[in-house]
Regions:
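Noncatalytic alpha-helical scaffold of FAD-dependent oxidoreductases
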Residues: 1-151
Length: 151
């Protein structure tokens, strides 16, 4: 499973130590760094508000799924997730397996005035999968279970 707060998979160790020379160069160029606190997944899950969505068979509303779909992979996203400074989450996440299910979800979103965020691999670095604060509920549609493109 993909890391909830960074690149890689949960079973990968991507930890690297900076050499003393590189650390000195970075300090000379940008100043001394300040380490962020490291939040646990459970700490971030505890911050997830109640969903504003009604039950739907294709939509997951559990807090962990919502955390895992709350941000992309930009540096600001990493810093927010790593430190636990996340303030918006989708209200629900759907993982359709067919074009019929996608149509059903979009019709449901239209009928219920939901904001829809399309989610591919979750690697966005431009912020478009991050829910903005809104009075309308947010539905993220994760296309990860779709296995082909049709023309």
């Amino acid at each position: 499973m993909r890391l909830w707060n960074g690149w890689g998979n949960e079973d990968s160790d991507l930890t690297m130590e900076l050499s003393d020379g590189l650390r000195a160069l970075l300090e000379a160029l940008v100043g001394p760094g300040t380490a962020l606190s490291q939040a646990t997944l459970n700490e971030v899950i505890a911050k997830v508000p109640n969903t504003r969505l009604d039950d739907h068979p294709l939509i997951k509303t559990d807090p962990e799924t919502r955390v895992r779909h709350a941000r992309g992979q930009s540096l600001p996203d990493w810093l927010e997730m790593h430190s636990g400074n996340v303030d918006t989450f989708p209200d629900g996440v759907a993982l359709p397996e067919s074009s019929e299910q996608v149509r059903e979800l979009l019709a449901h979103a239209k009928e219920n005035n939901l904001i829809v965020i399309p989610y591919g691999g979750g690697t966005s670095v431009v912020g478009h999968i991050n829910p903005e604060t809104s009075d309308k509920p947010v539905l993220t549609i994760d296309m990860g279970k779709m296995n082909s493109m049709l023309s």
